[in-house]
Amino acid sequence: EQVDDEMNNNMDYAAMSCQNCLSDAVDILTVNYFTVQYMHESGHSMDEFRAYFTEQTDYLKNEESMQYLGIYGYIDGELMLSTAWEQPEGYRIEDRSWYQEMKQNGTELTITTPYLDMKTNRQVVSVGRMFRDGSNLIGVDVDLEELSDLLKELDAGTGEIYIVDQTGSIIAGGEPAYMGKTLDSMYHRTDAYETY
């Protein structure tokens, strides 16, 4: 019974950590969304946007947590990142799954399906939102590998702790090779795990 209590406490902690990370990202996005949209409507320059994204990303890394890779925007057809990144030849933001999900949801808040970030080669989700004009957006990338590291530290007894998305795909926990796989495909049965 003591083992069950400890495992339940660890699962509570894991669930709360994930929820806190995502709700913090939503709060960060909300504050910056209105600021950046105002900057755009007021005619700020691209250099001012770059400086703003860099300043906000530095704040996140220094004051908040490294779970956030940065704040970015897609402003007037230009991808604005807080650090330099050479886009690969043929790169089109419109082809990226995270952009398509945000575009589909319009001004509604979007937490994207996990994807491999091309700049950092890390598994992330984006928390983002389109501007009222329907073509510009702002987002915050959340590093899922840090959540995985946190889950690895928790004692799950003889089991393992994973975070799965709505499709049943693993987005955090376990080995990096597990990312994107479904529990069903790993265990070849549906009763091998419990959801929490």
Regions found by a protein language model. Give the residues of each.
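A short, polar/proline- and glycine-enriched secondary-structure boundary/capping micro-motif
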Residues: 91-95, 148-152, 181-185
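GAF sensory domains
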Residues: 81-90, 170-188
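Hydrophobic beta-strand positions
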Residues: 73, 163-164
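Extracytoplasmic/periplasmic sensory segments of membrane signal-transduction proteins
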Residues: 5-108
